Amino acid sequence: MNKKSIRKILGGFKSYVPGGVSIRGTGGTDSARYCYTIWLRHLSILYKNGFTKIPNTIAELGPGDSIGTGLAGLLSGSKKFYALDVVEHTDIKKNISVFDELVTLFANHSALPDDNEFPRVLPRLTSYNFPSEIFADNNLENFLDKSRIQSLRNELVDIKKQKNSIKYMCPWNDPKIIESDSVDVVFSQAVLEHVEDINHTYDAMYRWVKKGGYISNEIDFESHGLSDEWNGHWSFSDVTWKLMKGNRPYL
């Protein structure tokens, strides 16, 4: 066992001590440009696979540092967004900052940040031009109407009370928090590799998604720093996993 694995196990022990381990931000979604490219990459892949409309209702698992990826969905025309997380990383100031920058990116039909800016981000696309074909039958300008933007911004300020277009639920465990057969697209970005009860999570996603809806998950199978090799964690025993995780909500 190398030094990195030993440090992770010691971190697992510390997690049982109150205040021993702090839950750090997840990274990524604190950047509006990251959220913009992630949402439009998922939407582009969905479009190429037959989902050619703007989804009315979307749900994201593990939004992380901000709910910006789902906000990008709302700015592209979605009407309702469910954000589900197990640890509350986000805050009002961060969400509003990301939202305001997203408005500008959409208004300018900005190209998607590509592999040069985010070299590790998947899925990759053949073109990073703004996907105008997706919005050909939809008036993007209407989605960016000043009154709609202000309404969404007001909801972000009071996100835990309003819950009209945006529902942030943290922590979540019961699939019944979202009505069955009510979501057009369920998506996640580098999240499901952290989930322990994966069967429960997939059952929930299939419960929520409408007939004809889609589930879009980008899963990062790398070690996330648990080992020196990208796939070194594959060799860990169940005991090692348990020791590393400790009392943390996820690893």
What are the roles of these predicted feature ranges?
Residues N173-V186:
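A short acidic, Gly/Pro-enriched loop at the edge of an enzyme's catalytic core
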Residues K53-D65, N95-V98, Y214-T240:
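Conserved class I S-adenosyl-L-methionine
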Residues V239-L251:
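Acceptor-substrate binding/catalytic loop of class I
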Residues L75, K79-I166:
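Class I S-adenosyl-L-methionine-dependent methyltransferase module
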Residues N199-Y214, D220:
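A short glycine-rich, Lys/Arg-flanked "PGG" loop and its adjoining helix->strand segment in the class I
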